[in-house]
């Protein structure tokens, strides 16, 4: 059963300055996302899509992102490149509180914008 759906869109240009700010990276992104970031040649786009996914996750929860650290929401990929979300700490606790057991995520981007949609599935409590 679908518990929640969230979508977010961001301007990629907003993240250009973030590509040179390690402090911001550590604040908003999981350590493994930062490792992947440094391997990626389209860095602002990389950050924008992941940030949009984190925002979309908060919207899908129905609570927003208050009381959780964005770095505890990790965007990663399976072996075929399909994105997936892993959540830790307060983000994981909030997911469990909704009855959520599965998270679906899709990312997309164009020249100027990046977007993400998140669907939380499970059994409502």
Swiss-Prot record:
UniProt keyword annotation of Lipid metabolism present: yes
Cofactor(s) needed by this chain: Mg(2+)
EC number: 2.7.8.7
Entry's localization field: Cytoplasm
UniProt xrefs under InterPro entries: 4-PPantetheinyl_Trfase_dom, 4-PPantetheinyl_Trfase_dom_sf, ACPS, Ppantetheine-prot_Trfase_dom
Disulfide bridges in this chain: none
Glycosyltransferase among keywords: no
Chain sites annotated for binding Mg(2+): 8, 55
GO CC, one annotated term: cytoplasm
EC top class, as a word: transferase
Catalyzed reactions per annotation: apo-[ACP] + CoA = holo-[ACP] + adenosine 3',5'-bisphosphate + H(+)
Alphabetized UniProt keyword annotations: Cytoplasm, Fatty acid biosynthesis, Fatty acid metabolism, Lipid biosynthesis, Lipid metabolism, Magnesium, Metal-binding, Transferase
Gene Ontology terms describing biological process: fatty acid biosynthetic process
GO MF, one annotated term: holo-[acyl-carrier-protein] synthase activity
Family: Belongs to the P-Pant transferase superfamily. AcpS family.
Record NCBIfam families: acpS, pantethn_trn, PRK00070.3-2
Function comment: Transfers the 4'-phosphopantetheine moiety from coenzyme A to a Ser of acyl-carrier-protein.
HAMAP family the record matches: AcpS
Designated name of the protein: Holo-[acyl-carrier-protein] synthase
